[in-house]
Each structure stands twice: as C-alpha cells, then as structure tokens.
Amino acid sequence: MKKLLAMMLVTCMSLSVLAGCGAKTEEVAAETTEPATEEAVADEAETEEAVTEETAAADTAEKEYKIGVIQLVEHAALDAANQGFIDGLNEAGIKYTVDQQNAQGDQTACDTIASKLVNDGNDLILAIATPAAQAVAGKTTDIPILVTAVTDPETSGLVTSNEAPGGNVSGTSDLTPVKEQIALLTEILPEAKTVGILYCSAEDNSIFQADIAKAEIEAAGLAWEEFTVSSSNEIQSVVESAVSKVDVIYAPTDNMIAAGMTTVAMVANENKIPVICGEAGMVEAGGLATYGIDYYNLGKMTAQQAVKILKGEATTAETPIGYLTAEQCEFAGNDETAATLGIDLSAYAK
C-alpha cells in the first residue's frame, strides 16, 4: 500500500513538472511569435505603401492629358502667347493632346467652341483673350481654365480676385505698362498736345487700359479724345476721323484693333499721325513704337501654371494671376514707319 501511494505521488509530481514546462514553452513561443507577427505586418504595410506610390508615380508619368485651347482671333500677340504655351508644355515633358480652336473674332463662334471644349471632357482649357475666357468660364465650374492675354481677370468677372481667384479660373495677365507707354509717347513726340485713344468699346480689357491712359495723359499735361469701334468694319472710318483731330494715336492691347492694325497704320501713316501701340505685334504691323510685354513669355508662364495644375500640385483657386514685370518689358520700334513719319528712333535702339 505504501509503495502504491509512493508511486502515485511520484506520478503526480512528474505531471506537474511537465505541465509547468509546457506552460513555459507556450509562453516563450507566444513571446517569440508576437513580435515576429507585428514585424511581418509592418513589412507588409511598407511593401503595400511602396507599391501604391510606385503605381501612382507610374500613372502620373504615363498619363496623357487632354487640353483644349480657344483663341479669340489671329494676330501676332495672341499667336505668340499660344506658341509660348505649347512650347512651355513641351519643355515640361508631359504627354498631352491639344485641340486648337480659333473663333476668328466671332463671339457666337466663341460660345460654340467653348461648349465643345467643355463637352469633350478636357483635363484643362486655355482661353486666349478676354472674350474667349468669358465664353468658356460661363460653360463650366469644374474643368480647370487658364487664361492668358487677359488684362484684368478680376474686372472681367473671371475670378474673385487676381490674388486669390477662388474658383476654376486662373492664368496670366497681359497688363502692359501704360504709364511707361505714355511717357514714351511724350518723349518721342514732345510737341504733341492731343492724344487720340483708339480701342474697341466691347472689350473690357481695352476699357480698363483706356481709363489708365486717360489719367496718365492728363498727368502729362496733354488732352485726350476717345475713338471707339464696335466692329472691324468701322476701323478705317474711325481712324480717318481721328487723324484730323489729334497729334498722335494711342492704341492699347485691343484685340480688334490689333487684328486690324494694318488698316490703322495705313490711314495714320498717310496722314503723318504716329501710333504708339500696346504691344510689339502692333508695331510690326505698322505702328511707330511701344514699350511692352513679350506675349511668347506670357504663354510660357501660363504653361508652367498648367503643368502644376494637371499634376495635382496646385489648383486654380489658389494660383494667383501671373504678371510679367516692368523689367521684362522691352522697347519695340518700326524703322520703316519712323522713316515715313520723319521720326528718329535711333536713341531707343538696343
């Protein structure tokens, strides 16, 4: 009996020891397994994140953007802005297709083209000149729109403010240094007493510049008289009326006048009336001189904005309207016109 009890006691003690060892083994295994599991989960998460980032980068690199362009009319300044935009996109190295549309100065065509570009589902639309910008901005609040060759987007009702656009429209302004242009006028033509301001009354950008010009002309001690047109058919008759009343004509960056500048120059130069212009393209078409911006560079500036917006690095709402500085403006003179008028521009040559 005693032997039996002793054997049972030994057996129980052995089982207790084995149970204790088993518990310790499980604890060690648990302690060893838990960190390993956490590390595996972390590694898996890092791998998934890396794959996601690589996929996103690949998608961005391979994406082909769809861009629509609406240009109001063909003339040197707007053509240069358009080319600068395209060259800027090419320099950025992005893949894109572009649908180029020109309204040929027709507001009805502007509206039709604007609707087409919106309905085509473009990733971004470039609008060149104020009427074109207003047309497309009225068709969508979703597609990013960049404008260029627009003098004052805020006054034109395109943005909440030029500093903080606040919507789907931003871009660049072609506000020229009107003050410096009037100063150039008085320097080249010190005997002038009356300045004729020639522009299209339907263009907000021209009205804005004309108001600045009036103040600067008055500050220079000169008189001014307005000569406005509402269609290209009126240009010749209006200029013919102006040349008998003024000593010089000032034409701001007005799209209708720019497109009809050869007619303006023909009438003015025949009557020995100099034309100081808002931009270099108008000078090339027969105007006397200007101190203005480079529209090609303005287009490239707009392209830089476009690339950031397309890549998701910026939004139109938070992209301020861009401007070229006065230091980036240059003198442009037409030697042939100067010779016709008997004016020496050699002092302004580079």
PLM region descriptions:
Residues 67, 85, 170-217, 315, ...:
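An alpha-beta-alpha
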Residues 18-30:
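Bacterial lipoprotein signal-peptidase II cleavage site
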Residues 204-273, 279:
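Pocket-lining segment of extracytoplasmic ligand-binding domains
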Residues 102-160, 254-269, 273, 277-278:
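Beta-alpha junction/loop-to-helix N-cap segments that form part of ligand/metal-binding clefts
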Residues 97-119, 227-242:
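Structural motif
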Residues 280-333:
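Flexible loop/turn connectors
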Residues 61-62, 153-194, 294-314:
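Hydrophobic alpha-helical segments within soluble ligand-binding/sensing domains
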Residues 62-86, 92, 99-108, 202-206, ...:
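Extracytoplasmic "Venus flytrap"
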